[in-house]
C-alpha cells in the first residue's frame, strides 16, 4: 500500500510456511511508524506462547521517551526510569557465579503494617510486609503468633509500650508457615541465648525484634534489641 509518494509505503511479506512480516518504508527519514489502534483490546495469542523483542531493543512505557526495559547484554536486563536515565533495577544471570539483583542508586523499602492488638493472641503477618509496628493496647499479650512467607528472609517487629507501660508478652512466640500451619521445624521462635527476651516495660519505650526465617527448615531465629527510650 502506497501514498502519493511511491517511495513511502507499507507492505506485508509472506515467506515459506506462512512466516509473515509487516513493514513500513520511509524513503527520506526513519519515521515510518506503525500504530495499532483497535477499538478494544490488543490481544497477542501466539501458538508458541512467545512474544519476542529483539536483543537490545527497548520496551517503553511513557510514549517512547525515557522509561523503559532493555537487555544490556546477554542475560542482563535493566529497568530505566525518568529523564535522568536512572537504573532502578538490574537483573543478571551469571551461571555458576550465581544470580544478581542490583538496585543501583535506589533505596528499597516496605510498607510498615500495624498488627491489631489482641490480649489473648496478637497476629503479626510477615507475609504482607517485612516491617511491622505493634503498640500494646489496654493490657499485656498472652501469645504472639508470627506468620512467615514461603521464602526465607529477614523480618522486623517494633513493639512499643503504651502510655501506661508494664505490658508483657507472657506466653509463646508462635511460628507459622505460609499456609498458616505451625512451622514443622520449630513451632516457636528460637531466641539468641535460649530464652524469650524480657521486654522493656517503661511507658512509651520501644523494643525491636528481628527474625531470620529459614523457610527450608521452617525455623525462625530471633534476637531482641531492647529499650529505645523517648
Where are these regions (language model features)?
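Intrinsic low-complexity, repeat-rich intrinsically disordered segments enriched
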Residues: 1-129
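Low-complexity, glycine/proline/serine-rich flexible segments
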Residues: 126-130, 134-138
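Acidic, glycine/polar-enriched metal-coordinating patches/loops
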Residues: 76, 135-230
Amino acid at each position: 500500500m502506497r501514498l502519493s509518494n511511491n517511495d513511502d509505503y507499507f507492505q506485508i511479506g509472506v515467506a515459506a510456511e506462512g512466516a509473515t512480516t509487516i513493514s513500513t518504508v520511509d524513503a527520506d527519514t526513519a519515521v515510518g511508524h506503525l500504530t495499532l489502534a483497535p477499538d478494544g483490546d490488543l490481544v497477542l495469542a501466539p501458538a508458541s506462547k512467545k512474544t519476542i523483542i529483539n536483543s537490545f531493543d527497548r520496551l517503553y512505557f511513557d510514549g517512547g521517551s525515557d522509561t523503559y526495559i532493555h537487555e544490556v547484554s546477554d542475560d542482563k536486563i535493566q529497568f530505566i526510569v525518568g529523564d535522568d536515565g536512572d537504573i532502578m533495577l538490574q537483573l543478571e544471570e551469571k551461571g555458576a557465579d550465581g544470580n544478581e539483583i542490583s538496585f543501583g542508586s535506589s533505596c528499597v523499602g516496605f510498607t510498615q503494617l500495624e498488627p491489631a492488638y489482641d490480649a489473648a493472641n496478637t497476629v503479626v503477618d510477615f507475609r504482607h510486609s517485612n516491617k511491622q509496628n505493634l503498640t500494646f493496647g489496654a493490657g499485656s499479650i498472652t501469645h504472639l503468633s508470627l506468620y512467615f512467607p514461603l521464602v526465607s528472609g529477614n523480618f522486623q517487629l517494633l513493639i512499643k509500650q503504651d502510655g501506661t507501660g508494664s505490658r508483657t508478652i507472657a506466653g509463646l512466640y508462635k511460628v507459622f508457615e505460609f499456609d498458616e500451619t505451625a512451622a514443622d521445624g520449630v513451632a516457636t521462635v528460637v531466641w539468641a541465648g535460649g530464652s524469650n527476651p524480657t521486654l522493656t516495660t517503661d511507658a512509651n519505650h520501644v523494643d525491636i525484634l528481628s527474625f531470620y526465617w529459614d523457610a527450608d527448615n521452617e525455623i525462625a531465629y530471633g534476637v531482641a534489641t531492647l529499650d529505645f527510650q523517648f
